[in-house]
């Protein structure tokens, strides 16, 4: 039987909200999309909630109402554009907006007010996907490897799927073993933060600014010494660890560097931590499929290809899947798994004690 779901994803980059309409039968097919750029005031509010401050509960409640109302408007626009009505949609899978992720301390916080979203859209909402895995001893992240496996496993070739959003994570898909996956480290988060602080640009288009600089070996060595990079998976990370303050902490110990050289070094950090993660996992992979915003960073894609000469590096576009929409599709699929009672975490990815059904249901 065919079902339609809507997936909503707002990632750690805080640049916008992705809304995807998914048709789900024996496979997942992207039908349509809608993108909402993050308003500057809401971006600032959400970023402020990623670190400790005054009156956090009230600030979070106000911010999530704004976020939720934006999503509801986006869902209504998408339905109208596709000549769909509320009754056509089985559920919305809403990831929410992560403001803290500290699985070692037993929590991951996503705001988004799924109850209000169900009320405003009159559609059942599935949300809160991470906490059940954490309750079972897992990292609660990454959650997309199971979807990567469903989408890209052809039972023939060994391949890896790399998502480069604010942070980068890998899914290792081999036909003769369970899917594995983990966070590698910063994806775009430091690149975006640095260019925003130095040039007041939202991101480094095509990686052009990074390409204009030179990698500084001393800075790179200091960045790579972070304990996270020495830890084997399962592992996940977030802005609590990698942020602009972390970059400045390491820069403070060095002579002044040209801003473009810092950007080049941050890009090298992203590329190296991805390729070293692949090597540490001893993954036998012929192909690396890249999704997320980082797939559009030409300098980063070029560097990955240079560091992985025996691996074909491609965008997921090769499989007819737009790299910008894989994560939103994944949360639509996770909503489907929840309603069907299908466990969707992977203990080989998160370290949980077992398979669990993920998500909390807010009926329409």
From Swiss-Prot:
ATP binds at residues 11-18. It is an enzyme of class 2 (transferase). One of its GO terms (biological process) is peptidoglycan turnover. GO terms for molecular function: ATP binding; kinase activity; phosphotransferase activity, alcohol group as acceptor. InterPro entries: Anhydro_N_Ac-Mur_kinase, ATPase_NBD. Its EC number is 2.7.1.170. Belongs to the anhydro-N-acetylmuramic acid kinase family. This is Anhydro-N-acetylmuramic acid kinase. It comes from Pseudomonas syringae pv. tomato (strain ATCC BAA-871 / DC3000).
